[in-house]
Structure formats: C-alpha cells, structure tokens
Amino acid sequence: MDKLNRTRSRACLICGIVLPHSVFANKGCPNDGVDDVETFTSPVFEGIMAMMSPTESWVARWQRIDTFTPGIYATRVQGVLNEDVVESLRRRGINYRPRNGTSWD
C-alpha cells in the first residue's frame, strides 16, 4: 500500500491489518484468508503501526502480530465477531481475540 487512505481503508477484526476495501474484497486477508469484507473488517480503527520484521519486533510480539504478514496494523479495531463466526474460526484453527480493547488476557 503506497498511501494509507483512511476513508477507503478497513481493518481486519481478526488480525488488525489495514488494507483498502478493494484488497480485502479481491484477495481476502493475507493473514487469515477470510474474504467476507463486511463480516470480518471494520472501517473504524484507532492508531496505526508499520510492522516490517515480525519476528524481530518487540512491538509485534506485544501486539500479538509477530506471526503475521509485514504491513500496517491498527492498534484497536471497533467491532466484534458474533459467536457463530468465532466458533467457525476456532474449527479452522484460528484463535480470535477481539482487537477493540476488551480482551485483557
């Protein structure tokens, strides 16, 4: 992404990566493969950070994005997934942790 356009960008509710709506719609999320833009992304997010070296970054470990694709990530994403969707993710081996600041584990 050359330039972050906050009016056209969305953040993934699962991993927090920030991408243009069109990328999510055409390719899905690069980290978890979901492609239902309306269910799995939100246009409302706070703070952004660029993560270029996931395995070397203490911030990436702290934000729990150290196993994800390098890119721009939101520190908080407004919205949560419903329980049916969370269960479906769990069956696929994806551990969902809300990125809206409500999870304190």
From Swiss-Prot:
Protein origin, superkingdom: Eukaryota
Biological processes per GO annotation: mRNA processing; regulation of DNA-templated transcription; transcription elongation by RNA polymerase II; transcription elongation-coupled chromatin remodeling
CC annotations in GO: chromatin; chromosome, centromeric region; cytosol; DSIF complex; nucleus
InterPro entries: RPABC4/Spt4 (IPR029040), Spt4 (IPR009287), Spt4/RpoE2_Znf (IPR022800), Spt4_sf (IPR038510)
Coiled-coil ranges from the UniProt annotation: none
UniProt keyword terms in alphabetical order: Centromere, Chromosome, mRNA processing, Nucleus, Transcription
Main location class: nucleus
Keyword Nucleus among UniProt keywords: yes
Record localization: Nucleus; Chromosome, Centromere
Pfam families: Spt4
Molecular function GO labels: RNA polymerase II complex binding; transcription elongation factor activity; zinc ion binding
SUPFAM superfamilies per UniProt: RNA polymerase subunits (SSF63393)
Family from the record: Belongs to the SPT4 family.
Subunit composition and interactions: Component of the spt4-spt5 complex. Interacts with RNA polymerase II.
Role noted for this protein: The spt4-spt5 complex mediates both activation and inhibition of transcription elongation, and plays a role in pre-mRNA processing. This complex seems to be important for the stability of the RNA polymerase II elongation machinery on the chromatin template but not for the inherent ability of this machinery to translocate down the gene.
UniProt xrefs under PANTHER family: SUPPRESSOR OF TY 4, TRANSCRIPTION ELONGATION FACTOR SPT4
Protein name: Transcription elongation factor spt4
Organism encoding this protein: Schizosaccharomyces pombe (strain 972 / ATCC 24843) (Fission yeast)
Lineage: Eukaryota, Fungi, Dikarya, Ascomycota, Taphrinomycotina
